[in-house]
Amino acid sequence: MVDAFVGTWKLVDSKNFDDYMKSLGVGFATRQVASMTKPTTIIEKNGDTIILKTQSTFKNTEISFQLGKEFDETTADDRKVKSTVTLDGGKLVHVQKWDGQETTLVRELNDGKLILTLTHGSVVCTRTYEKEA
């Protein structure tokens, strides 16, 4: 099922991203720059390992993980988190935990688009990606 997510995805729409970053404690200047960028997400699979790369003019990040196994992650806004990614009902569910806080990043496919729903407390952000040829 993970195979359906494999590919290169370009951001085409974003809703409530600034509020989401604000809830995480991201500073004003960083939020301004991050809000303007249109990142590309590259999802690859190598055996049991999934590689998720995010590339933009703001910052490039890369994580490698196996489903259901906790790993250390440094986020684009430099949070040091414990992350776990699972496959749940056709959705990739990525949970980040740090300092007693938790945020959830859910990736799902809908009409050929990758929908990323970010949740931190009561703040929900939706980012839509289209697959590049």
Swiss-Prot record:
InterPro entries: Calycin, Fatty_acid-bd, ILBP, Lipocln_cytosolic_FA-bd_dom. Keywords: Acetylation, Cytoplasm, Hibernation, Lipid-binding, Phosphoprotein, Transport. GO terms for molecular function: lipid binding. One of its GO terms (biological process) is hibernation. GO terms for cellular component: cytoplasm. The keyword Cytoplasm applies. The modification N-acetylvaline is found at residue 2. Octadecanoate binds at residues 127-129. The modification Phosphoserine is found at residues 23, 83. The modification Phosphotyrosine is found at residue 20. Coiled coil: none annotated. It is found in: Cytoplasm. Hexadecanoate binds at residues 127-129. The modification Phosphothreonine is found at residues 8, 30. Induction: Up-regulated during hibernation in brown adipose tissue. Pfam families: Lipocalin. (9Z)-octadecenoate binds at residues 127-129. PANTHER family: FATTY ACID BINDING PROTEIN. Forms a beta-barrel structure that accommodates the hydrophobic ligand in its interior. FABPs are thought to play a role in the intracellular transport of long-chain fatty acids and their acyl-CoA esters. FABPs are important elements related to the hibernating state in mammals. Belongs to the calycin superfamily. Fatty-acid binding protein (FABP) family. This is Fatty acid-binding protein, heart. The gene is FABP3.
